[in-house]
Design a protein with these regions (language model features):
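Active-site catalytic microenvironments for nucleophilic, acid-base chemistry
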Residues: 69, 166, 205
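Glycine-centered structural positions embedded in regular secondary structure
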Residues: 55, 131, 135, 162, ...
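Single conserved hydrophobic/aromatic residue that forms the stacking wall/gate
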Residues: 1-11, 198-207
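Gly/Ser/Thr-rich loops at beta-strand to alpha-helix junctions
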Residues: 153-159
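Short, glycine/charge-rich flexible loops or terminal/linker lids adjacent to PRPP-binding catalytic cores
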Residues: 169-200
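Conserved short alpha-helical segments that host acidic/polar catalytic motifs at enzyme active sites
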Residues: 5-83, 88-147, 152
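Structured, non-catalytic alpha/beta "coupling" segments that mediate domain-domain communication
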Residues: 85, 160-172
Length: 207
């Protein structure tokens, strides 16, 4: 029994060492989740550019990039994986490994304004709250004279609402988004992006 436990410890160290060796060669933002034969491993880049969270479903741990995924399966949010942290979960035990020198967290702003689902939690607030607050801050900097505020859906809805409420303006949904069109900005050519732009949003002429 002690011999098998010793071999297991060696295997565990070798697995983590290989992961550390690999991620030391990577520059940029990433969050990784890996399954080995006996463990669940999560890794977040040293700057925390991409999000990664830990949840618990009954007696088992789960990992995902957004807290909304935990809500869907009924899992309880435990915490965020810290920047530069490797989380090893084995036999329902969680171990934290931090092989990188400590760096200042620099999350991707697109997570806050675009990528994250509105109900996902980022730094203690929902993405919806972050976006609405951005609209409020924009209103403080730009005292405009307008009749209505119209968002570009869907990610702009919360920011436009915050902007309108702060300035006491009417908020109207003047654009209708086609939800069957994907994200246009990640398409490889300007021609495709321009084509999809015409099918992505349409003006609601009745308002």
């Amino acid at each position: 029994c002690s011999q098998s436990r010793g071999l297991g410890d060696v295997y565990k160290r070798q697995t983590i060492d290989k992961i550390v060796d690999a991620i030391f060669q990577i520059q940029g933002g990433y969050s990784l989740v890996m399954l080995t034969q006996n463990s669940l491993v999560g890794v977040r880049d040293p700057f925390g550019i991409r999000p990664l969270v830990i949840g618990k479903l009954k007696n088992s741990y789960v990992m995902t990039s957004e807290t909304c995924a935990l809500d869907i399966i009924g899992a309880k949010f435990i915490r965020e994986v810290e920047n530069g942290e490797i989380v090893l979960i084995e036999n329902d035990e969680l171990k934290s490994i931090k092989p990188f020198p400590q760096k200042k967290v620099r999350p991707c702003v697109f997570e806050y304004i675009y990528f994250a689902r509105p109900d996902s939690i980022l730094d203690g607030k929902t993405a919806y709250e972050h976006r609405k607050n951005l609209g409020v801050e924009l209103a403080k900097e730009n005292d405009v004279n307008a009749d209505i505020v119209v968002p570009v859906p869907d990610s702009g809805n919360a920011a436009a609402l915050g902007f309108a409420q702060h300035l006491g303006m009417n908020f109207e949904l003047g654009l209708v988004r086609n939800h069957y069109v994907g994200r246009t900005f990640i398409e490889p050519s300007q021609k495709i992006r321009s084509c999809l732009l015409y099918t992505s949003d349409a003006a609601d002429e009745r308002n």
